[in-house]
Protein backbone atom coordinates (compact mmCIF):
# COMPACT_ATOMS: atom_id res chain seq x y z
CA UNK A 1 0.00 0.00 0.00
CA UNK A 2 0.86 3.63 -0.18
CA UNK A 3 0.31 6.69 -2.31
CA UNK A 4 1.72 8.27 -5.44
CA UNK A 5 2.60 11.92 -4.91
CA UNK A 6 4.17 14.57 -7.12
CA UNK A 7 7.15 16.75 -6.33
CA UNK A 8 6.41 20.37 -7.19
CA UNK A 9 9.88 21.64 -6.33
CA UNK A 10 11.46 24.94 -7.26
CA UNK A 11 13.62 23.33 -9.93
CA UNK A 12 12.97 19.59 -10.03
CA UNK A 13 9.96 17.34 -10.06
CA UNK A 14 8.91 13.74 -10.34
CA UNK A 15 6.47 11.22 -8.98
CA UNK A 16 7.23 9.34 -5.77
CA UNK A 17 5.62 6.47 -3.91
CA UNK A 18 5.01 7.19 -0.24
CA UNK A 19 4.80 3.86 1.56
CA UNK A 20 2.68 3.29 4.66
CA UNK A 21 5.84 3.18 6.80
CA UNK A 22 6.86 6.66 5.60
CA UNK A 23 9.52 5.59 3.09
CA UNK A 24 9.60 7.74 -0.03
CA UNK A 25 10.70 5.91 -3.20
CA UNK A 26 11.19 7.47 -6.68
CA UNK A 27 8.47 6.24 -9.08
CA UNK A 28 9.09 8.42 -12.17
CA UNK A 29 11.87 11.01 -12.42
CA UNK A 30 12.29 11.30 -16.19
CA UNK A 31 10.45 10.83 -19.45
CA UNK A 32 11.98 10.54 -22.92
CA UNK A 33 15.44 10.78 -21.34
CA UNK A 34 14.70 14.17 -19.75
CA UNK A 35 14.42 14.85 -16.02
CA UNK A 36 10.94 15.94 -15.02
CA UNK A 37 10.52 19.60 -14.16
CA UNK A 38 8.31 20.49 -11.17
CA UNK A 39 5.43 18.04 -11.44
CA UNK A 40 1.86 19.08 -10.68
CA UNK A 41 -0.57 16.17 -10.37
CA UNK A 42 -0.90 12.39 -10.50
CA UNK A 43 -4.09 10.36 -11.08
CA UNK A 44 -4.57 6.59 -11.18
CA UNK A 45 -7.61 5.58 -13.23
CA UNK A 46 -9.82 2.52 -12.78
CA UNK A 47 -7.67 0.56 -15.27
CA UNK A 48 -4.54 1.16 -13.20
CA UNK A 49 -3.05 3.64 -15.67
CA UNK A 50 -1.16 6.54 -14.12
CA UNK A 51 -1.65 10.04 -15.56
CA UNK A 52 0.82 12.79 -14.61
CA UNK A 53 0.70 16.51 -15.38
CA UNK A 54 3.53 19.00 -15.70
CA UNK A 55 2.35 22.61 -15.83
CA UNK A 56 5.36 24.12 -17.61
CA UNK A 57 8.95 23.34 -18.51
CA UNK A 58 10.02 26.84 -17.44
CA UNK A 59 11.94 27.46 -14.22
CA UNK A 60 10.78 29.27 -12.21
CA UNK A 61 7.25 28.12 -13.00
CA UNK A 62 5.85 31.65 -12.66
CA UNK A 63 7.34 32.35 -16.12
CA UNK A 64 4.73 29.96 -17.59
CA UNK A 65 1.81 31.89 -16.11
CA UNK A 66 0.91 33.68 -19.33
CA UNK A 67 -2.29 33.50 -21.39
CA UNK A 68 -0.73 32.37 -24.66
CA UNK A 69 2.16 30.29 -23.35
CA UNK A 70 1.56 26.56 -23.72
CA UNK A 71 4.34 24.16 -22.84
CA UNK A 72 2.54 21.96 -20.31
CA UNK A 73 2.16 18.25 -20.91
CA UNK A 74 0.56 14.99 -19.76
CA UNK A 75 2.45 11.73 -19.19
CA UNK A 76 0.88 8.27 -19.27
CA UNK A 77 2.39 5.34 -17.38
CA UNK A 78 0.87 1.98 -18.32
CA UNK A 79 2.21 -1.42 -19.42
CA UNK A 80 4.35 0.39 -22.01
CA UNK A 81 7.14 2.78 -21.05
CA UNK A 82 6.16 6.18 -19.60
CA UNK A 83 5.44 8.61 -22.43
CA UNK A 84 4.13 12.07 -23.15
CA UNK A 85 0.61 11.77 -24.59
CA UNK A 86 -0.36 15.46 -24.81
CA UNK A 87 1.70 18.64 -25.18
CA UNK A 88 1.22 22.36 -25.75
CA UNK A 89 -1.17 22.80 -22.85
CA UNK A 90 -1.62 26.12 -21.05
CA UNK A 91 -0.22 25.41 -17.56
CA UNK A 92 -1.48 21.85 -17.14
CA UNK A 93 -3.09 21.28 -13.77
CA UNK A 94 -5.34 18.55 -12.39
CA UNK A 95 -6.50 15.77 -14.75
CA UNK A 96 -9.04 13.00 -14.22
CA UNK A 97 -10.60 10.22 -16.26
CA UNK A 98 -14.38 10.59 -16.39
CA UNK A 99 -15.92 7.57 -14.61
CA UNK A 100 -18.63 7.03 -17.24
CA UNK A 101 -17.27 8.22 -20.60
CA UNK A 102 -13.59 7.36 -20.04
CA UNK A 103 -12.56 10.75 -21.44
CA UNK A 104 -9.64 12.58 -19.86
CA UNK A 105 -10.45 16.04 -18.51
CA UNK A 106 -7.68 18.52 -17.68
CA UNK A 107 -7.60 22.05 -16.33
CA UNK A 108 -5.35 24.42 -18.25
CA UNK A 109 -4.98 27.06 -15.57
CA UNK A 110 -3.46 29.96 -17.49
CA UNK A 111 -5.33 29.23 -20.70
CA UNK A 112 -8.39 29.54 -18.42
CA UNK A 113 -10.14 26.47 -19.74
CA UNK A 114 -11.22 22.94 -18.91
CA UNK A 115 -10.33 20.64 -21.81
CA UNK A 116 -11.34 17.09 -22.66
CA UNK A 117 -9.69 14.35 -24.71
CA UNK A 118 -11.06 11.04 -25.93
CA UNK A 119 -8.78 8.22 -24.76
CA UNK A 120 -8.00 5.33 -27.11
CA UNK A 121 -7.56 1.76 -25.88
CA UNK A 122 -3.78 2.32 -26.17
CA UNK A 123 -3.94 5.50 -24.07
CA UNK A 124 -3.61 7.97 -26.93
CA UNK A 125 -5.35 11.29 -26.32
CA UNK A 126 -7.54 12.29 -29.28
CA UNK A 127 -10.02 14.97 -30.31
CA UNK A 128 -9.20 17.70 -27.81
CA UNK A 129 -12.22 19.89 -27.11
CA UNK A 130 -12.86 22.78 -24.75
CA UNK A 131 -15.49 21.97 -22.12
CA UNK A 132 -15.51 25.48 -20.61
CA UNK A 133 -13.68 28.76 -21.06
CA UNK A 134 -13.49 30.72 -17.83
CA UNK A 135 -13.75 34.47 -17.30
CA UNK A 136 -12.08 37.26 -15.39
CA UNK A 137 -10.08 36.00 -12.43
CA UNK A 138 -11.20 32.40 -13.01
CA UNK A 139 -8.07 30.25 -13.24
CA UNK A 140 -9.14 26.59 -12.98
CA UNK A 141 -7.11 24.44 -10.60
CA UNK A 142 -8.71 21.29 -9.19
CA UNK A 143 -11.98 19.59 -10.07
CA UNK A 144 -14.25 16.63 -9.39
CA UNK A 145 -17.15 14.94 -11.15
CA UNK A 146 -20.60 14.63 -9.57
CA UNK A 147 -23.19 11.87 -9.99
CA UNK A 148 -25.29 14.03 -12.35
CA UNK A 149 -22.50 14.34 -14.93
CA UNK A 150 -21.41 17.77 -13.77
CA UNK A 151 -17.90 19.02 -13.10
CA UNK A 152 -17.07 21.06 -9.99
CA UNK A 153 -14.06 23.32 -10.58
CA UNK A 154 -12.04 25.28 -8.03
CA UNK A 155 -10.54 28.53 -9.25
CA UNK A 156 -7.40 30.02 -7.75
CA UNK A 157 -7.13 33.82 -7.64
CA UNK A 158 -10.93 34.34 -7.61
CA UNK A 159 -11.64 31.80 -4.84
CA UNK A 160 -14.64 30.45 -6.72
CA UNK A 161 -16.18 27.03 -7.00
CA UNK A 162 -17.94 26.64 -10.32
CA UNK A 163 -20.19 23.79 -11.42
CA UNK A 164 -20.44 22.95 -15.09
CA UNK A 165 -23.55 20.90 -15.81
CA UNK A 166 -23.57 17.97 -18.22
CA UNK A 167 -25.12 20.26 -20.85
CA UNK A 168 -22.39 22.90 -20.41
CA UNK A 169 -24.17 25.43 -18.19
CA UNK A 170 -21.90 27.33 -15.79
CA UNK A 171 -23.09 28.00 -12.24
CA UNK A 172 -21.04 29.81 -9.60
CA UNK A 173 -21.56 27.86 -6.36
CA UNK A 174 -19.19 29.84 -4.12
CA UNK A 175 -17.70 33.26 -4.82
CA UNK A 176 -15.26 34.45 -2.16
CA UNK A 177 -13.37 36.84 -4.45
CA UNK A 178 -11.21 39.73 -3.34
CA UNK A 179 -11.85 42.17 -6.18
CA UNK A 180 -8.60 44.10 -5.64
CA UNK A 181 -6.59 40.86 -5.77
CA UNK A 182 -8.41 39.68 -8.91
CA UNK A 183 -7.76 43.06 -10.57
CA UNK A 184 -4.07 42.94 -9.59
CA UNK A 185 -3.64 39.46 -11.08
CA UNK A 186 -5.59 40.37 -14.22
CA UNK A 187 -3.30 43.37 -14.80
CA UNK A 188 -0.20 41.19 -14.42
CA UNK A 189 -1.73 38.47 -16.60
Language-model regions, residue ranges each:
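Structural recognition of the beta-propeller blade-terminating site
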Residues: 19, 63-64, 78, 118, ...
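Loop/turn-rich, solvent-exposed surfaces of beta-rich toroidal or solenoidal domains
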Residues: 112-113, 132-172
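Short, solvent-exposed loop/turn segments at conserved positions within beta-propeller repeat blades
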Residues: 8-13, 59-71, 109-112, 156-157
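Blade-loop segments of beta-propeller domains
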Residues: 1-16, 25-31
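Beta-rich, blade/repeat-based domains predominating
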Residues: 1-7, 32-50, 56-58, 68-74, ...
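Beta-propeller blade signature
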Residues: 16-22, 69-79
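A short beta-strand motif characteristic of beta-propeller blades
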Residues: 24-32, 81-87, 127-133, 170-174
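Short loop/turn segments immediately following beta-strands, especially the blade-tip
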Residues: 117-124
Amino acid sequence: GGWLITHLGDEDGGVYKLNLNGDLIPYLLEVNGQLLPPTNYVHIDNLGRVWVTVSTRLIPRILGCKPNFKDGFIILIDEEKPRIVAENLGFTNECLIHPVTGDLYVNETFSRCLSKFNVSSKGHLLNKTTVMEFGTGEFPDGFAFDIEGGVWVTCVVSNKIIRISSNGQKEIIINDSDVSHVNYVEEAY
